[in-house]
Amino acid sequence: DCCRKPFRKHCWDCTAGTPYYGYSTRNIFGCTC
């Protein structure tokens, strides 16, 4: 899960169905976990 440490700072993808969907508020797309 990309929303969990230590990966959350590296998640940038907002595309549903992908391994990196739904990320932290730190990413450039503004996604949230």
From Swiss-Prot:
It is found in: Secreted. One of its GO terms (cellular component) is extracellular region. It comes from the Eukaryota. One of its GO terms (biological process) is defense response to bacterium. Keywords: Antibiotic, Antimicrobial, Fungicide, Secreted. Has antifungal activity against N.crassa and F.culmorum. This is Mytimycin. It comes from Mytilus edulis.
